[in-house]
Amino acid sequence: MSWRNHRAPAHPGRRRGAGPSARRRMVVVVGLLSLVSVGLVARAFDLQVVRKQFYQRQGDARFLREMPIPVSRGTIFDRNGEPLAVSTPMMSIWANPAEVLDSDERIPALAQALGVDADSLKAQLAQRSDREFVYLRRQMAPAAAQAVLDLGIPGINGQREFKRYYPSGEVTAHVLGFTNIDDRGQEGLELAYDDWLAGKPGAKRVIRDRMGHVVEDLEQVRAPKPGQNLTLSIDRRIQFLAYSELKNALEKSQADSGSIAVLDVKTGEVLAMANLPTYNPNALGGSRPGQRRNRAMTDVLEPGSTIKPVLMAAALSSGKYTPTSPIIDTTGGHWYFQGHDIHDTHNYGLLTPTGVITKSSNVGAAHIAMTLDTALMYDTYRAFGFGNSTESGFPGEAAGSLRIGRSWRPLEKAILGYGYGLNVTVLQLVNAYATIADGGVMHSPSFIKGGDATSKQIISPEVAGQLLRMMETVTGPGSTGTLARIANYSVAGKTGTAHKASIGGYAKSNYTSAFAGIVPASNPRLAAVVVIDNPQKGSYYGGTVSGPVFSRVMEGALRLLDVPPDNIGRWYVGGPLQGTGLVGAQPPVDAPIDDAPVDEDTP
């Protein structure tokens, strides 16, 4: 074979006709790789530049959270620094329902730790699965809440909160009020001073892990402002005493309700205010709306004979009367005026103005009222605060009612002289007596220590002094308020027994029994009013039912405040005049006596 015709064997790694095809394939591969690279670069550009903020927000939404920084509500103290309302740290458990449902096999353990039914808990989570925050249980004890968190269930978290606690419970309930589960004031001084006490929660930005636990605090968004403390005018010792004596009186008389208020006459500070029935603010679930009402502030009553010192203030100011003159004829204990029988419980014959106070004569008071200028009488009642709010700042305070003087009909004017035809609150009444006690200076009642600087002279010091001496006779022998006496102290006061209004007139057997007084009479320090509503057992007279409560509370308060005894051992000359020229022998006084209303058809 010729070597020219010989063909060398093909190279084992070379294929025929591969040149152009290989290049085409190479181009395709390179093109695809280039497209992939461009896509990756574009995606990276989209992630890092175009949609960077969107994805960052999405990531933050999963792991970056703004959490509240809870603040403690301010503590409420009594005037001596004793705590009346404090905030205790608690823990609330909340959940992200969707995350918890992903571990639904652990729901029974969660339910057991929370103290709830497992099926109910699962249903609750399912119903709210579209939310990211749902409370499972509020205000748990920290140890119990930590036991829930220790289960390590995804989506279960804790939030620190505070719960209000009232050490004195029902004793101070009506004054303090209470807060709701979010620690905001709902009634009483908790509501009145809510902004002061609540403070403002702060906020911080944190990073949470997938279990919801905080792994890092990033920054404080808003600084917390804790609530400020509040010091009240209330003296816890006197408050306990007032509450205890009021409770004993209601149990003894089987009355429907009762109220007592004690004021410092020099400042207008409320030292004690108690009502029954009451409630426990630490266990609101068992209370009724009627139990939560501060009756001394929100309820009104016809004051009955406790208004007579105010009538006498107008009489003395008019210049027509002095404590001993003129002589008033009570016309045998009955005065038939415009077809109505205004009557006393006894025939007192001839009385001085002081005697009208001593014996609580309705006939005498009505006669005095009808001799006074209507404008003067109305202005005096109004100046003493009747028909006006005391502006104490207490939520829901009633203003009472007093018709404008020019609209008074003669009969209306007569019965206004002994406390019918107007409505007052217990606070208004005790403030009126405190005004007499402080030389005719009226202070705005205050629940805050230090009192209110607002004051005004409404009657002259001379008239106020005369009224005090006239009112001292009420606790003297043969008068209506002997049971309100206090050993070694002089007492100026006034009893009041009023029929309660009912449909069509006045109820024959339902009474409001009251005593209002000032101690010591020679140098007044305290004024107090006790009102017992509808006593059903024993006597219903104000001097008999409410007088002893006043006596025991004031005796204890004077001792607690270190007020020295005055024990003046004298009585202002007043009461029924003796002598053949004026009146025969007076009937014996078998029991404390008081007023009665006109006939029940009185308008």
Where does each model-flagged region fall?
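Periplasmic/cell-envelope proteins involved in peptidoglycan metabolism and beta-lactam response
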Residues: 1-284, 375-385, 506, 533, ...
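Beta-lactam-recognizing serine transpeptidase/beta-lactamase-like catalytic domain environment
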Residues: 4-7, 85, 208-221, 260, ...
